Structures are given as structure tokens and as C-alpha cells.
């Protein structure tokens, strides 16, 4: 939270770390976890299931793993659970039928959990026209889309505005990461070829107001072992795309002058922050004048 993030996403609830008492999977700890997150100004917008909808695992195993995520989402009041299908051999129609069958089996569990299943734009569904056709076959309010900004744009060379045209009404949550084609590796945000500004513009065109979740695997850049620095870099990079809120300006009693902060109130800002704000509000005036 000190880094300025507003949410955290849970991935792989079957990791041993989640088997402990007091972990997010512990239903008896849910109330305390929600209280602690609220006090820190954080929320959990999404839980990521790890099941591959198109692999050779049985339908029962797939549904059980995702159902665990849905039950945990219900306990923690999480609105979304991500499901994914990566590339596997098979005819497209047969693959779509398999995914459709699994989602239809899971829908009653999701509805009971008051949670929405989000199919990620990854694997065969990085082709968002294909994903849209699948969603049209489902014709259900309980299924939305997790837009992985990287996959359609970089893997399928699909313009972001085309993704919006295909899926705009279904987008509930967003993942982002950057990629360096020269080295063929993922990299820190802003150091690769992902057109972040264009993607953010596409999100703004559909009035997206949800979270943008940064994906990072420490093995992608072993020399950047300090995750605090990685996330701080992401937060700093993304701050340029934030819309600054309109901030109140205070007038003096005669309305002959204006001040940025209320009179005789201690402000929690550093000197550089004060200087930046004064320069922003009064760009044509001297912010600080030193005399000798």
C-alpha cells in the first residue's frame, strides 16, 4: 500500500502458502482479512485460477479447482475469478465446445458465490473475434472478459481499438506487462514494445474504471530481485496515465487572492511536492523567491 497500489490479486490458491491457518483460503479468517484490507485501503479485485481449460485434465478436476477459487471469492467478497485456456492441439470448434461446456457447468457455482467468471484474452482467445463468438454463444451475464493487454496486441498483432470493438462491453478486469522483442523476454514497464499509451486510450474509450493489474514473474529478470523496486517502478511509470483530480483552491476573505491549502492547517507534503503543486496551479507566478 505504501507504493500507492489499490488492490492485490490472488494467484494459485493451491500453493502451500495458502494452506495455512489464517490464509485467504481459510474461511474462518475471511472476516479479519477483509477488515485488514479495508484498513489499508486495499481490495482483492480478482482471484486467478490456474486450471487450463483445454489441457488433458478431467472436467471434474478442472471444475473443482475453479470452484475452490469461487468459494474463496465468496468468503472474501471478491467479484471476479479468472479462467484461462492456453494453446493446445485440437480443432477450434471442438475447443470452443469444451470451454463452453466447462463454463456452463461452473456458472451455477459462480452465481451462488455472487461472482463473475472472467475468460482471459490468452491462448486461442487472444483472437478476440473468436472470443466474442464464444461469448455470444453463452449469452450469459455471469461471464465476462479479463483483457490481458499484452496477448492480443503483441501475439496476434490486433490493434487495441479492434479489441475494444470486439469485447468492450465484456471487459471487467485488466492485466498488463511489457515485452522486449529483441531479447524475446518480458521486461519492466516502459522498457519494451507494448504500446501502453494506445492501450490506456482504448480503455478510456470504454470508460473502464476497474483495476489495471501488473503481472510479474521474478524469473523474467533475475537481476531485479527486489519486488518492491519492481512495483515502485510500475507505479511510477503508470502515474503518467492517471487523470489528475480537480483539487480545490481556497480564496481569501476579500476574494483578491487564492491559496492552495486552507489557512493555518499543517499540510502533509514534502518541499518538492509543495513546489510541484504551486507550479501546477500558478504556472505564471514565482513559486519561491529567495532574497539576500
Positions of PLM-derived features:
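Conserved beta-strand positions in the central sheet of alpha/beta enzyme cores
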Residues: 9, 46-48, 82, 118, ...
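Short, solvent-exposed loop/turn segments at secondary-structure boundaries
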Residues: 20-24, 56-61, 92-97, 156-158, ...
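Glycine-rich, proline-tolerant flexible connector loops at the mouths of alpha/beta enzymes
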Residues: 9-34, 86-91, 184
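N-lobe entry segment of adenylate-forming
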Residues: 239, 246-292
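Active-site acidic/histidine proton-transfer and metal-coordination neighborhood
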Residues: 31-32, 36-46, 52-145, 154
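Histidine-acidic metal/acid-base catalytic patches
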Residues: 1-6, 31-34, 38, 77, ...
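Short, conserved active-site loops that position catalytic residues or coordinate cofactors/metal ions
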Residues: 3, 8-17, 45-50
Amino acid at each position: 500500500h505504501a507504493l500507492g497500489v489499490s488492490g492485490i490479486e490472488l494467484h494459485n490458491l493451491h500453493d502451500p502458502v495458502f494452506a495455512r491457518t489464517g490464509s485467504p483460503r481459510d474461511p474462518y479468517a475471511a472476516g479479519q482479512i477483509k477488515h485488514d484490507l479495508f484498513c489499508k485501503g486495499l481490495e482483492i479485485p480478482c482471484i486467478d485460477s490456474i486450471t487450463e481449460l483445454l489441457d488433458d485434465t478431467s472436467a471434474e478436476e478442472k471444475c473443482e479447482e475453479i470452484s475452490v477459487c469461487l468459494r474463496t471469492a465468496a468468503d472474501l467478497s471478491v467479484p471476479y475469478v479468472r479462467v484461462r485456456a492456453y494453446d493446445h492441439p485440437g480443432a477450434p470448434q471442438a475447443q470452443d465446445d469444451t470451454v463452453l461446456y466447462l463454463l456452463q457447468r461452473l456458472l451455477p457455482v459462480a452465481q451462488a458465490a455472487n461472482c463473475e467468471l472472467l475468460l482471459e484474452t490468452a491462448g486461442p482467445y487472444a483472437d478476440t473475434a473468436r472470443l466474442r463468438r464464444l461469448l455470444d454463444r453463452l449469452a450469459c451475464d455471469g461471464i465476462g472478459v479479463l483483457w490481458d493487454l499484452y496477448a492480443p496486441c503483441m501475439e496476434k498483432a490486433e490493434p487495441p481499438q479492434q479489441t475494444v470493438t470486439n469485447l468492450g462491453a465484456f471487459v471487467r478486469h485488466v492485466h498488463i506487462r511489457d515485452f522486449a522483442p529483441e531479447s524475446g523476454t518480458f521486461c519492466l514497464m516502459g522498457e519494451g514494445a507494448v504500446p501502453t499509451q494506445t492501450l490506456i486510450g482504448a480503455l478510456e474509450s470504454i470508460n473502464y474504471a476497474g483495476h489495471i493489474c501488473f503481472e510479474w514473474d521474478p524469473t523474467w529478470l533475475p537481476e531485479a530481485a527486489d519486488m518492491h523496486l519492481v512495483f515502485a517502478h510500475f507505479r511510477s511509470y503508470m502515474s503518467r496515465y492517471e487523470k489528475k483530480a480537480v483539487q480545490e483552491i481556497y480564496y481569501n476573505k476579500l476574494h483578491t487572492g487564492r491559496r492552495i491549502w486552507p489557512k493555518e492547517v499543517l499540510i502533509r507534503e514534502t518541499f518538492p511536492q509543495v513546489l510541484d503543486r504551486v507550479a501546477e496551479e500558478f504556472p505564471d507566478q514565482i513559486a519561491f523567491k529567495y532574497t539576500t
